[in-house]
Amino acid sequence: MARISGIDLPKNKRIEIALTYIYGVGLSSSQKILEKANIDANKRCKDLDDNEVSLIRSIIDENYPVEGAAKRVESMNIKRLMEINCIRGKRHRVGLPLRGQRTRTNARTRRGAKKTVAGKKK
């Protein structure tokens, strides 16, 4: 089983798909990595030899912020938006959708479960 950036890649999947299990590596970047490493995208993870794995590992370490580094960059960007008080930062702070979605109905994922309010007594 190949271990890259602290993630055990699934051995029966194609290497192109297996690389997407690493946070910060999507399908397009995994295709670029394999193209740069000159490895067939249809090859299974279990069929990779050690120098191919080390080549992929070195390409990812040099060119891509992955796992903790990518999460750190993302959280710093959100924190920066909140500090400069732009509309996206304010929406992050309040926990509402950022990109113009309606909030009168729906938006349950972002707002959380319904908070029931006691009805008025007559």
From Swiss-Prot:
Keyword Ribosomal protein among record annotations: yes
Compartment list: Plastid, Chloroplast
Gene3D superfamilies in UniProt: 1.10.8.50, 30s ribosomal protein s13, domain 2
Stretches for region Disordered: 102-122
SUPFAM superfamilies: S13-like H2TH domain
Alphabetically ordered keywords of this record: Chloroplast, Plastid, Ribonucleoprotein, Ribosomal protein, RNA-binding, rRNA-binding
Coarse class of the protein's main subcellular location: plastid
Molecular functions per Gene Ontology: rRNA binding; structural constituent of ribosome
Domain of life according to the entry: Eukaryota
Keyword set includes Heme: no
GO cellular component: chloroplast; cytosol; small ribosomal subunit
Single GO BP term: translation
Entry's family note: Belongs to the universal ribosomal protein uS13 family.
Subunit structure: Part of the 30S ribosomal subunit.
Known role: Located at the top of the head of the 30S subunit, it contacts several helices of the 16S rRNA.
PANTHER family in the cross-refs: 30S RIBOSOMAL PROTEIN S13/40S RIBOSOMAL PROTEIN S18, SMALL RIBOSOMAL SUBUNIT PROTEIN US13M
Protein name per the record: Small ribosomal subunit protein uS13c
Source taxonomy: Eukaryota, Cryptophyceae, Pyrenomonadales, Geminigeraceae, Guillardia
